[in-house]
């Protein structure tokens, strides 16, 4: 049976999907997946400007996404490699190019989003759920929000910042995450 677990977005908004039935081995992959999620989100250097996704199949882990510094890529891979049940890690995490303009844009977007009243409750979290990845002035929003309104507001705020060339909105709502999890089981 083919089993695939994947995440949607950084804060590692954890949704797991399987293309076949659920058995003991699938449970093991789900446990590994949950451990990966915890390891990544508890990494102190993992910020709202990084986005990492993981997939697990029979203990083989594939990491994808983008981080702001090379040491983060290495540290995340090392953390995942040490998890019980992980056989092999394929690290496909990309390191974003160094750009002072992109750095300034990241911070402007983060300030604008988290100073909006719709996101005040998220701003005080240790790992806020909206992650902002900027590469060559192109913005990708990832993570989980509470509603479609929050998703649209975040996209609107990001797109209204000076210097933004495009916005890809990969934010998921709590309901979408819940629905994906229910389909899994």
Regions found by a protein language model. Give the residues of each.
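N-terminal targeting leaders
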Residues: 2-10, 14-185
